[in-house]
C-alpha cells in the first residue's frame, strides 16, 4: 500500500515555509509549542464567538507566529478580514488582550497584524470550512464538493482534489468519496501544493475532509 506523507511537511524548505518561527532550548521546546497552540486556539475561539459571516465561516487561512526575546509577532492571514477590521482598533486590541491573558506574558510585547489573502477560495482551510458548513446544513456531499471546485476555479488554481470520509449522508457503513479536477502532482516536490485536513461534526457522526490544491509549479 502507498504510504501517504503530509504534503506540507514533505515540501518544507522548498515551496512551503514554517508557520512558527522561533528558537528554544531543547528543554523549553515543548513549552514554546504549547504556547503556539494556545495562541492559535485563542484567536480561533475569539473569531468564532465574535464574528460570523452569513455563511458561518471564520475565513482564517493560517496564523504565523514569530517570537523574539521581547516580542511575539502574530500575523493572521484571513480571506475576509473586514470582519475583524470593521471597528479595527477595538477588535484587534480586544483580541490582543485576550491572547495576553491566555499566555500570561508580562515581560513580552504582543503584536497582532491582519493580512488579507487575494484569493480566499484558493486556500484549502477556507474551502474546508465552506464544505463543513454545507454538510452541517445537510446539503448533499457531491453538491458541496462540486461547489467547492467551482469556487477554486475562480481563484486560478491548476488542480484540486477533495476527499470526504465517514458516514456520508447518514449511511450505516462509513466510506470515502473523492473528486479531482485538473492536475494534483503529489510526488513532485517543486509543485506548490496546499493541503488541509479537518473534521466536521454532523448529526450522524464525524466526517473527515481533506483538500489538496495545486497552486503553481516553481
From Swiss-Prot:
Coiled coil stretches, renumbered: none
Identification of the protein by name: Small ribosomal subunit protein uS3c
One of the GO biological process terms: translation
SUPFAM superfamilies referenced in this protein's UniProt entry, alphabetically: Prokaryotic type KH domain (KH-domain type II) (SSF54814), Ribosomal protein S3 C-terminal domain (SSF54821)
UniProt organism field: Crucihimalaya wallichii (Rock-cress)
GO molecular function: rRNA binding; structural constituent of ribosome
Top-level taxon in the UniProt lineage: Eukaryota
HAMAP family in alphabetical order: Ribosomal_uS3_B (MF_01309_B)
A Pfam family matched in the record: Ribosomal_S3_C
Principal location class: plastid
InterPro entries, per database record: KH_dom-like_a/b, KH_dom_type_2, KH_sf_prok-type, Ribosomal_S3_C_sf, Ribosomal_uS3_bac-typ, Ribosomal_uS3_C, Ribosomal_uS3_CS
CDD domains named among the record's database cross-references: KH-II_30S_S3
Cellular compartment(s): Plastid, Chloroplast
Amino acid at each position: 500500500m502507498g504510504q501517504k506523507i503530509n504534503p506540507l511537511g514533505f515540501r518544507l524548505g522548498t515551496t512551503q515555509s514554517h508557520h512558527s518561527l522561533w528558537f528554544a532550548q531543547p528543554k523549553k521546546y515543548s513549552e514554546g509549542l504549547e504556547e503556539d497552540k494556545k495562541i492559535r486556539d485563542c484567536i480561533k475561539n475569539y473569531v468564532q464567538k465574535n464574528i460570523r459571516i452569513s455563511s458561518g465561516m471564520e475565513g482564517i487561512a493560517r496564523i504565523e507566529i514569530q517570537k523574539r526575546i521581547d516580542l511575539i509577532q502574530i500575523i493572521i492571514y484571513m480571506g475576509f478580514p473586514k470582519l475583524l477590521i470593521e471597528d479595527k482598533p477595538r477588535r484587534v486590541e480586544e483580541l490582543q488582550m485576550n491572547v495576553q491573558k491566555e499566555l500570561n506574558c508580562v515581560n513580552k510585547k504582543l503584536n497582532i497584524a491582519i493580512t488579507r489573502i487575494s484569493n480566499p477560495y484558493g486556500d484549502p482551510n477556507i474551502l474546508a470550512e465552506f464544505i463543513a458548513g454545507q454538510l452541517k446544513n445537510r446539503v448533499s456531499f457531491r453538491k458541496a464538493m462540486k461547489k467547492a471546485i467551482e469556487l477554486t476555479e475562480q481563484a486560478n488554481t491548476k488542480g484540486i482534489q477533495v476527499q470526504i470520509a465517514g458516514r456520508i449522508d447518514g449511511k450505516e457503513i462509513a466510506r470515502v468519496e473523492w473528486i479531482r479536477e485538473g492536475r494534483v502532482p503529489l510526488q513532485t516536490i517543486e509543485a506548490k501544493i496546499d493541503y488541509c485536513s479537518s473534521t466536521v461534526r454532523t448529526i450522524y457522526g464525524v466526517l473527515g475532509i481533506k483538500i489538496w490544491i495545486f497552486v503553481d509549479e516553481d
